[in-house]
Amino acid sequence: MAQGKISGRVYDSKSGQPIEYATIAVLKVQDSALVTGTVSESNGSFEVTAPYGKYLVRVSFMGYKPYVHPETVTLGERHATVKLGKIQISPSAVMMEEVQVRAERTMVEYQLDKRVVNVDKNLVSSGGTATDVLETVPSVSVDNDGTVTLRGSSSVKVLINGRPYEMMGNDLETLLEQIPASSVESVEVITNPSAKYDPEGMSGIINIKLKEKTSGALGLNGVANLNIGGPLPFMVPDPLPKIIPTAMGSISLNYTTEKYNLFFSADGGQRSRGSQGHSNIERLRHGSAWSHDTIDQYSIRGNYMGSMKVGGEYYFDSKNSLLLSYQLRGGKRHRTSNIFSHDLLTDGILDYTQLDTNDNANVNHVFNLSYIKKFDEKDRELTADATFSMRHVKGNGWQEQSFRDTLINGIYNPMWDRYYLRQTESENHHKALNIKVNYVHPFAETWKLETGYEGRMDWPDQNAVYFRTEYDDLTHTLFRYHDTISSTHFNYTQQTHGLYATVGGKFNDHLSAQAGLRVEYSYLLGYDVNHPATDSVRKSYWEPYPTLHLSYEINKSNSMQLSYSRRVRRPHMWDLNPYLDVREGQEMSFGNPNLDPEFTNAFEFSYNLSLDKWNIYTCAYYRQTNNMMTRYGYVWDSVSHQRYSWWMPYSSQYDGYWASTWQNLDKGYNFGLELIVDWQVLKWWKINASINLYRSTIEGTALLDNKSQSATQASGKFTSFMTLPNDWTIQFSGQYFAPWLDLQTTMFPAYWCDLAVKKDVLQKRGTINLRIGDIFATGGWGHETYTEQLNRVVRSRRISPTITIGFSYKINNGLKQKPQNEEEEDSGSENVY
């Protein structure tokens, strides 16, 4: 039977804003019997097919008067497509101006292959950055060094709006500190991704979704934010400055018409953090201590950031759209550390002070082009996305030490006093291109095929030059020279090309499945520009990555999921580059050009129970890793160098330093249990709590003298939301990390609590918020390392509590609707399915 199409757009008659989920019913002229129907999309548009004939078109939406198109719609060979244009519907008489829909999303939404954590209403991260947002996400943690972990593993792929974070800015720590929390809408946690996603990351993917649009309304819409704060001055220890300020502001605007959407956003400010640390380091030779260091460190890190994004999306018709955007992101990071050391040697006492200063400035350009093609068949879609970025980072570092040998063999000699300066000049360039094409083809009513290509090409260039200034014992003068051992100019090229396909759908009302396969080719070439023949690495390989997801819905309240995926963790440029990075406390690190990727087989079984006031999610997961990558440390000397660092030139000037690098082990195993609970205690009070418990085992290798090593780790998070009268909201959250064991290191427990209060003002167009971070000043990290060559205990804490005060204002604050749970007059809504 020949069919035609009826299309149009639904708008609110007063505000002019599009209405999503309005019911469009196609009725017979003779008896008004329902023939077919649909619902409107987010931009108000709809399209419905019907057999040739004459029809009435009725539009209805809860809280609005029903609308019947005044003209009979006739579909036939001469008029196979009828465009109704703009349809305006009016609010019902009982709909009052001040009443709004409060369709609050739950904090955690569960989908077939991911969890979506809605953080746009999170108060404890308000006034902060994306780092603060991630700290509130169940199963995710961020330590003092900015390392992001998922279920205790740092092997996690971090994306920004579905693109690798390297496309968006500098290193991950800096980038997260440069993204305001107010710009983050949600965080997707994908612990066992399908073949559609990049297989990089042993423990999964964290996708930070930024707010692209402020509203779906026509006309000009936007939101502005301003936050200021810092730690309490009387909690800041000397010699740090008493005022460590934080100030951040942002504005986001978009202008929408029926044919296009223009958007602009800008943010900037300063984020400063202070920390205090204490270390005890004992170095051993032949089982006996030959030095004992006591080190106190006081640091302050300042991030000065700014970004601007401008772009537009053009709608050719209801099926085709093109988006073009440009983003400029820049910033400057400054870090100063004051270090005081007291070193007990076997032949004397050495005191020294050290001042470390590091500055770097970065500029990043990101260009994005996206195309979306929707077909007549529902859910059939073609998308293409290309992103190109250019980054330039220029840095300078100074490490200044003043030594004083107070006693040598029991006698003080001022001639042994020393001065030492290490200066770094670095300049890094990074170009990257990411291309993704995805096609979705539905078939057999409930099934769909999804296939595509994803390619990523990286061209980083790292250039770091080191200079030293030392005291000459003979001339008693200072001399400066170029440190060729530590200097590096490393050029790197990496390409990854992948083809993937997934097939998924429903067997019946209870059982759903999705199977996929991704095949990738990876190629990398890295070399030192000054020594290309000797200091180089070249690798290439083909690898398959199969995935499988099964879901069984017992009833509306109970469901189960089983999944499998093969994952990979590839070495990064800095993991492979064998240049020496010498740091305070006689420590240094370097890359391993012989490092190979690790591969993981990941299994998960989850159960979700959804009741009236409860949602309980439980998950058991198991990961088996081959060729496991791990960081390994030892005391640098000629004997250890031959065993662990055959690719590094030996230098006696670093004898006694603690050296760390990357090594491949044999196998690793992880088994864990995860529990996430959402509880609506009262109408105005809800709680979210999560617990993660897992055990890891490292299979015996030569590094472990062919012995296995196991450790157990646990962590938990708790969040309480209270919505009080007169538009007050209070949020309290706490986190706890139990002690855990790594290959050579035991981490100490860590815990802290945050408190936030919000008040809506100016008829809910404005919001005032107050946040107190780490209210009990317990936040900090620590670890201890015990080997045959080194005993080390390190503790550090951030300067807290911190207080942040912020204000947010919404421009043209969206569509006002009647709550669905209130009584209303008959709107004529009907179920068209």
State what each model feature region is.
Residues 523, 556-602, 622-654, 740, ...:
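Surface-exposed extracellular loop regions of Gram-negative outer-membrane beta-barrel proteins
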Residues 29-45:
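Short, acidic Ser/Thr/Gly-rich low-complexity loop/linker segments typical of extracellular
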